[in-house]
Amino acid sequence: MKLTLFLLTICVLTAAPDPRFAFRELDGGRLELRENGAPVFVYNYGPQLKLGVPEDRHRSSYLSPVYTPAGAIVTDDFPADHYHHRGLFWAWPVVETQGKVYDHWMNMTALARTVKTPAVQESPQSASLQADNVWVADGKEIVREALRLTAYPAQKDSRELEVELTLTATSAPVTLRGSREQGKSYGGFSARFAPRQGTIVRADGEVLIKDEDLVPRRWAELEGIYNGKRAVLRITPDPADLNAPYQWCLRNYGFVGASFPGRTASSDGYTLEPGKPLTLKFRVKVTDLP
């Protein structure tokens, strides 16, 4: 009896624990992260296009769906009102290089492509994903995009993600600009939210009754009820980022975007130079609410 208990104890102590985080490959160039068996997000590294959507809306290098710890899906992809919106994404409507103008936002004349399958690491403390992408325009690589994404364990009702994005022009300067529409400058790190009820948009602790553009904010979030589950997603740019605090594009229909480089009297674009990388960092927090 004592020997049996001893052997059982040894087996329990030496058994490899199940990892808290685990990535798994899905079809169509997608990587899913799970925490203790529950989905966290899907990173779409291969080209994605929904049936019935125009060909020029295909895209890659973005997160969707994104889940709360309780399983609420808070992001949307290919929404009918803005096919080009795509979960958590980073894109610019105006990309200029060598006298030509391309679109990395909607019509995708500058398209992000994956160089190789993303590298992943898993541990009880975090899970990380590193992806090397290139922006291709007219068959030429114009920007190298290095993505590092880190997910941390859920703490009660919340989970945090860190996104680090490094952009480098390849052989010629590339200028990034926001929207050319008057009074707007969307373009940068953005989130499109899933259909929901009870929408509340906040920025720096202020509830916004109306949509807002070009106002500098330290953070912004959108709260809503998703299939009966109330949740909120907040985006906080790193205060050390260039041009922080950012101007924002905030929409009650379900869009929150940190505009980089924004539009001011002295600045209306940012030029990437070959050999001089630009790094932008963001923290994304998803929280289940009572």
Indicate where each model-derived feature is located:
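Extracellular/lumen-exposed scaffold segments
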Residues: 51-102, 203-219
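Glycine-rich (often Gly-Gly/Gly-Pro-rich) flexible segments and glycine-rich loop motifs
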Residues: 180-228, 232
